[in-house]
Amino acid sequence: MSKFAIVLFGFGLSALVAGAAMAQSEPRMTGLKLSGDDPIQIESDRLEVRDAEGIAIFTGNVNVVQGPTLLKSGKMTVYYATDGASESAPSAGPDASRIERLEVDENVYVKTETQVATADKASFDMKTEVLVMTGKEVVLSDDGNVLVGCKLTVQMATGHALLDGCGQSEGASGRVKMLLQPKSQSQ
């Protein structure tokens, strides 16, 4: 289950990478690094594995922790290949090489030492390496800098990120918002 946990953690961390890259205008996503030395702890109120369907569902107070990084949500679903890719004995869940996509729902929250990302939903396609975060507001913050939109799409392989506004219904401006905090020069 260790490789499986690393992939789940990578999903949460990739959300933060997207925010940092957009705020810093870097051409590539360079911050996606997992610490192989720190243990990964996954907790939820319930874990249901439907091996025949290729689904593992974590529900209720889902927490994924590695070092200072935390991913929280109400539900996390893992979809994995069931085509007999693994000839070994049945396990308590999919191995990392078989995972196709991850979906996180219900108040998605990811935090590192300096960054926070929130959304209503998020998904990560392992084959295409595309991360999508959506919600009434997708908020990315890093050291006082804040980005707000309603849909963030990140091509992890190329570093291309797109943040869409929220449409113009129910008082929303339909525009992406960014707040940048200049660093103090007096010290």
Language-model features, listed with the residues they occupy:
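Mature-chain termini and adjacent capping regions
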Residues: 1-187
